[in-house]
Amino acid sequence: MHSFVSRFGIRRALGFGAVAVLAVASHAVAAAPAKPAEVQQIELFQRLPAEGAASLQALIERFNAQSKEYQVVLSEQDWKSANAPHLMILEGDDEERFLAGKPRFKPLYAVMKETGSALQTLRPPAMMTRTPVDSKGQLLALPIGLSTPVLFLNRDALRRAGMNPETTSVATWFDLQTVLGRLADAGHTCPYTVAEPGRVMVENLSAWHNEPVAAMRGKVSAPSFNGMFQVKHVAMMASWHRARYLQVFERGNEAGQHFASGECAVIAAPSNSWAGFRSKGTIDVGVAQLPYYDDFPGAPQNTLADGPAMWVAAGKKAAEYKGVAKFVSFWLQPENQVVWQRETGYLPLNRAGLLASRSELLGTDLENIKVAVGQLTNKPVTGDSAAQPVVGREKVRRIIDEELSGVWADRKAAKEALDNAVVRAAGS
């Protein structure tokens, strides 16, 4: 996107005599004014939640204010257009479609290397989604929106039910059950809800207890999330649903909206939800680690990090990739990492961001990140607690949620629902 603009002066061909006359007369030949450098635009496509979109816009404005050669502009064109944007923030189904078929991206590590730019990120850990990482652990894309499920609590609701938010334990699922019972007794109609049930109840609870969600069938990895542990947890959640401790909302971010409004007192949701919950200002929000079963050997283990990543389009000019690298480097500067974490709730991308999350100077602004990082690094990752390279992950999550809806409607037992989900996922 940067085009090299040569600066040139106009030189006149002068004979010896003319030079002598000019020398005597001391007439200087003036250079023509330099042509102003062209500004190269870097187009970026994104569909982040409100807090993320606003923070990204502010980041772009800061970059543009200090960059003379490159300007980042938001684009409505996505990767399906004939001239795809240089940068695309993708997740879920859109990311999976983008990655299907012929390669449409240039690996981020290659962009940074070819432009002589350092990629100042943490090495991708084993509990992070494998989508933006190659087999050598190199970043194919920048995972700008990582999160992991944690527990959020309406501290005001706990106080009204006679509990002290500072001392009330929700460390285990049985602790949480006691808390939800007291909330229900106090008249709360939605003590607990969960965003993305399949992601929380199956993927992350399995990793949190070092239980596999896939098994090798010959040389192929096949879904295997219908074991005794997963069945036990879903069965317990079904009993909570019947007791009206748990409400499940199946449309988009509806669960988060019910928590933010104060209707639901506790929610298991992605750690980045912290930014949105606090921005509403309607409730006093607390955050805690996801509960675990203390009667399960070795628990808790670690949870998983997932979320949108920023991909670089293939087929662009070398000068344009230089602009991309400059923007990525700017994003990874310590001060920008701190602002990004505070405003979006997403996990740190490098050591500077990680250190900021531990700083006492920021008060509770990054409390969600402290909790999330504590979960992710609780114990060294094992083969069973590592993120699995699942093909069609979003489709599998939808299958799990669809089967679980039969449990909430009291049409299916926990084992039947999970058995069905495994069969459907294997054939998807």
Regions found by a protein language model. Give the residues of each.
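Short, solvent-exposed loop/beta-turn-alpha elements that line the ligand-binding surface or hinge
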Residues: Y109-R123, T168-S169, P191-Y192, E211-K232, ...
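Hinge/lid segment of periplasmic solute-binding proteins
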Residues: E95-V150, N204, G286-A288
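C-terminal capping/gating helix-and-loop segments adjacent to ligand/active sites or protein-protein/ligand interfaces
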Residues: D134, E367-A425
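Glycine-centered hinge/linker elements that transmit conformational signals in sensory
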Residues: Q177-L183, K219-E250
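Short amphipathic alpha-helical coupling segments at ligand-binding clamshell hinges
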Residues: S55-L59, K232-M236, A318-W331, A417
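Conserved N-terminal structural module of periplasmic/extracytoplasmic solute-binding proteins
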Residues: H2-F4, G15-G17, A23, A28-K102, ...
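Extracytoplasmic/periplasmic solute-binding protein
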Residues: S135-I144, F174-A222
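Extracytoplasmic/periplasmic substrate-recognition and gating elements
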Residues: A65, A161, L246, S279-L347, ...
